[in-house]
Amino acid sequence: MKILVTGGAGFIGSHFVTSLISGDIATPQPVTQVTVVDKLGYGGNLRNLAEASADPRFSFVRGDICDEGLIEGLMARHDTVAHFAAETHVDRSVVASGPFVASNLVGTQVLLDAALRHHIGRFLHVSTDEVYGSIDTGSWAEGHPLAPNSPYAASKAGSDLLALAYHQTHGMDVVVTRCSNNYGPRQFPEKMIPLFVTRLLDGLDVPVYGDGRNIRDWLHVSDHCRGLALALGAGRAGEVYHIGGGWEATNLELTEILLEACGAPASRISFVTDRKGHDRRYSLDYSKIAGELGYRPRVDFTDGIAETVAWYRANRSWWT
């Protein structure tokens, strides 16, 4: 398998690449080439790929997925695509949506067109539960209507639909995955867990939006990578698969866990004005990937948080 990984210097992408190279996740064929293309924006970091870069099968190309000439040349040398590259921060999308439309929608279109021309064997499109909006009770199944509430979520919903349309129109071998909120080492400190952990380690307060009762399901990045490998290897073309973590908590409950893990007092909580379009609750039903492909999350949340906090303690130079 010669796989092109877009956004592979980012948080989830770099964990996926490292797991591919190390053999920690199973693949349908032996991995003979792993090429990462990443523009190295604020969320991308070559240090995330230090382990993978020592392997002769690995190569890195700095570039933008919207660059048609670059993508055309790369696609010609690969037979599989794992598409992680995206602008992903809701707050940034509220302030300026243009980069999200460009990267998440137009960039995906550039990749799909090139993949179609070069008869790519499988195109794995990595997405998010945020495309569904908010759910008060129960959990979303894959067939639930999309109802994104932020520009970021809307751009991802559009890219999902575009990828699936290439399967319907052209018969392209596309699989879409949608995941819960990820956490783990090497996550850029704009997302809640690394933001709060790094602020607490620096002796600062942590900003909790609104009343703190928004609910999220949390997924360790290693579990996500295992789910992605299953979808890549055995998922049915044209299908969507949910990859969930199975651990829900309010933001306030999560904050209290992080305070304890970092040895900080409750006085470090600072309630701030809620953000625009803040979804109240996310919850994915991942019984489809469990039943078809045997996926189960393995990382206990308490253990995962302890590992994550320990990593940020030990790697201050990475985030300062």
Swiss-Prot record:
Disulfide topology: none
Annotated catalysed reactions: dTDP-alpha-D-glucose = dTDP-4-dehydro-6-deoxy-alpha-D-glucose + H2O
Keyword Protein biosynthesis: no
EC number, as in UniProt: 4.2.1.46
Cofactor(s) required, per the database record: NAD(+)
Record-linked CDD domains: dTDP_GD_SDR_e (cd05246)
InterPro entries: dTDP_Gluc_deHydtase, NAD(P)-bd_dom, NAD(P)-bd_dom_sf
Residues annotated as catalytic: 129 (proton donor), 130 (proton acceptor), 152 (proton acceptor)
Assigned keywords, A-Z: Lyase, NAD
Gene Ontology MF terms: dTDP-glucose 4,6-dehydratase activity
Cofactor mode of binding and number, as noted: Binds 1 NAD(+) per subunit.
Binding site residues for NAD(+): 11-12, 38-41, 64-65, 84-88, 103, 152-156, 182
GO BP term, pick one: polysaccharide biosynthetic process
Annotated substrate binding sites: 88, 128, 181, 191-192, 207-209, 216, 251, 274-278
Family in the record: Belongs to the NAD(P)-dependent epimerase/dehydratase family. dTDP-glucose dehydratase subfamily.
Subunit structure and binding partners: Homodimer.
Function: Probably involved in the biosynthesis of the acarviose moiety of the alpha-glucosidase inhibitor acarbose. Catalyzes the dehydration of dTDP-D-glucose to form dTDP-6-deoxy-D-xylo-4-hexulose via a three-step process involving oxidation, dehydration and reduction.
Annotated protein name in UniProt: dTDP-glucose 4,6-dehydratase
Species for this entry: Actinoplanes sp. (strain ATCC 31044 / CBS 674.73 / SE50/110)
Gene: acbB
